[in-house]
């Protein structure tokens, strides 16, 4: 087995290698003056089971091309099997047609990954679960929940908490976490616009008065949804509001928005390399995802069950 990393999140690749007590295969990924990407693998990979680690986060197109070109190089170098390890799968929010004459970009990206040479895909918390079906190759979609459950239990102990979905679409994800937290109570933030031209109203489904609320979402991009939901929960009497997300996209001024909000804490994993600004923020904390990914890679390499990782 060999591990190889592109440039999107090298610290995560190093941490996965440490978990597996391996070293990363030597390679070079560089960008020419005209912005073309060049890849070279500096070790023999013939007949090897290779895992390529690369999140397709910002800059999404550059990171996607790095992954595609790296897999093409591995295929031409006669690697026996290529697994694309994509902790954060970019373009996942473009999983369906939202209007006439619009693309389904997530499906296109899935096709590109397969065509470039991937034999299987390993990813974490796809924005929409059906994206697994976009691939015609085996695809393992890991759940970040266990990482969060351990942290929540450590920090809150026996305190009564309520798991909150920041929107109706995330209820299934929130319910799954609540079950892992000894069937914790569940609440939902329901955003509604009463009529055209009127501002959005936050309705809270569930009683959060005096409760410690744990919001769960797959990602935090602009931070607006979580900040607004936290304000609504506090207005309805929540004693504290923390948010747990798998992917800290944190676009634009998201860090400042989180810091200015009433959100007590944003906890995210490192599927995307956190910026220095995020790391220094007193409101943001990062959980390592490398043990989960490393164990999944070990199981795939040894032909063991990946789903048993979540049998608890």
UniProtKB/Swiss-Prot annotation:
Binds 2 Mg(2+) ions per subunit. It comes from Hyphomonas neptunium (strain ATCC 15444). The keyword Oxidoreductase does not apply. ATP binds at residues 34-36, 93-94. Keywords: ATP-binding, Cytoplasm, Kinase, Magnesium, Metal-binding, Nucleotide biosynthesis, Nucleotide-binding, Transferase. Involved in the biosynthesis of the central metabolite phospho-alpha-D-ribosyl-1-pyrophosphate (PRPP) via the transfer of pyrophosphoryl group from ATP to 1-hydroxyl of ribose-5-phosphate (Rib-5-P). Pfam families: Pribosyl_synth, Pribosyltran_N. Its main location: cytoplasm. Its cofactor is Mg(2+). Homohexamer. Pathway: Metabolic intermediate biosynthesis; 5-phospho-alpha-D-ribose 1-diphosphate biosynthesis; 5-phospho-alpha-D-ribose 1-diphosphate from D-ribose 5-phosphate (route I): step 1/1. Mg(2+) 1 binds at residue 127. It is an enzyme of class 2 (transferase). This is Ribose-phosphate pyrophosphokinase.
